[in-house]
Design a protein with these regions (language model features):
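A short pre-motif secondary-structure segment
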Residues: 98-101
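Alpha-helical scaffold within the catalytic cores of cyclic-nucleotide enzymes
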Residues: 85-89, 118-138, 169-171
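Short regulatory alpha-helical coupling segments
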Residues: 20-21, 34-54, 85-94, 112
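Catalytic-core segments of nucleotide cyclases and related cyclic-nucleotide turnover enzymes
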Residues: 112, 116-124, 141, 155-211
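Cell-envelope/extracellular polymer assembly enzymes that use nucleotide-activated donors
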Residues: 56, 149
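Conserved nucleotide-binding and Mg2+-coordinating catalytic segments in signaling enzymes
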Residues: 20-39, 60-74, 82
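Juxtamembrane or sensor-core-proximal signal-transducing alpha helices
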Residues: 1-20
Length: 212
């Protein structure tokens, strides 16, 4: 009887652990999901304030993904997303970094203890690694393969700043990268953050609605 109980206990433990893992990960790409990303960022924020460490948020969006799906089919689209996720995951793998599928064809990365120059280096490695996959994309006339655009916001958190404000900055950077030709990186500076929180900075994404 004891052996059966022990076997059942191990099975129950493994099932609980598996369910916990599934609750934290995106089922398609294997990256963390949006809920985990948001929760991680909220925990990381006060830690960065206390330790006076920089934080960077990167929003990474697959260019012309709708046209890719339309041309190659949803199964190929899913495979492309998995390959993109695998390519960029390597560059946000430190203990306090996190990469998540943030929705659709968009990924988000939070990097701890980095400045703007370091964040841009990571973003460029991500952008280049996806391009080097050389996934054919006839809908991308300029490049002929699957590419990503990246918006970067790198700041030193303080108590008068919010996580949402920095996410908005990264989103605006992503919008500018799309606007300026895609397959590129755009960053938002500290000064632009100040303009955002004072209402001077206008978010063009509110007008854009949906990216491609």
């Amino acid at each position: 009887i004891a052996k059966h109980v022990d076997k059942w206990s191990r099975a129950a433990f493994l099932e609980t652990r598996l369910n916990a893992e599934l609750a934290q990960h995106d089922p398609l790409t294997g990256t963390k999901n949006r809920r985990v990303f948001d929760e991680h960022l909220l925990r990381l924020w006060p830690k960065a304030i206390e330790e006076r460490r920089g934080i960077a948020i990167l929003l990474i969006d697959v260019d012309h993904f709708k046209s890719y799906n339309d041309h190659y089919g949803h199964q190929a689209g899913d495979d492309a997303l998995r390959r993109v996720a695998q390519a960029i995951q390597t560059f946000a793998s430190r203990p306090l970094d996190v990469l998540a599928r943030y929705g659709g064809e968009e990924f988000a990365a939070a990097l701890h203890d980095v400045d703007e120059a370091q964040a841009l280096q990571v973003a460029e490695r991500m952008r280049r690694s996806v391009a080097e996959l050389n996934i054919e994309h006839e809908g991308s006339r300029a490049f002929g393969c699957v590419t990503v655009s990246v918006g970067v916001a790198a700041i030193n958190p303080t108590r008068d700043r919010t996580v949402q404000g920095v996410l908005q900055l990264a989103d605006q950077g992503l919008y500018q990268a799309k606007l300026r030709g895609r397959n590129r990186i755009e960053t938002m500076s500290d000064e632009q953050h100040k303009m955002l929180v004072t209402g001077v900075f206008s978010l063009a994404t509110a007008k854009d609605g949906k990216r491609a």
